[in-house]
Amino acid sequence: MKRQIILSAMLLAAAGALACTNFIVGKKASKDGSVICSYSADSYGMFQDLAHFPAAHHQKGEMRQIYDWDTNKYLGEIAEAEETYNVIGNINEWQVTIGETTFGGREEMVDTTGIIDYGSLIYIALQRSKTAREAINIMTSLVE
């Protein structure tokens, strides 16, 4: 077992550190059946504060301004949900958790007209979903 841990650590250390880090343990892998998820935006100087979005009720017709997660550049507006849930980091009050390990992409694939970047998509989905399936549906509807 020690040999496997050491080998895994060496392989991880040798890999380029340009993507974010997720640590996920399923209920069958933990000693007490707990599910453990952690996320860190730790690539190339992306260290950030712990995000907090308190639960809220919004007026019908209220708009939400979208700013790029990486650059804070204004991208546009979308309709705000009438109710949003409490989010701390990458988990909401319903225990929905979203992580990511993006690594750039091809420049010719960038949609310059898009108004929702991946970071905003994560936080919007967490603020609006009670289940993982609901989060997927919300994210899909926002990018279609």
For every predicted segment, state its role.
Residues 1-4:
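Positively charged n-region of N-terminal signal peptides that target proteins for export
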Residues 7:
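Anion-recognition interface
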Residues 14-15:
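N-terminal signal peptide c-region/cleavage motif recognized by signal peptidases
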Residues 18-20, 127-128:
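Generic detector of solvent-exposed, compositionally biased contiguous segments
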Residues 20-118, 138-142:
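A contiguous strand-loop segment
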Residues 122-144:
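A conserved hydrophobic secondary-structure block that centers on an alpha-helix together
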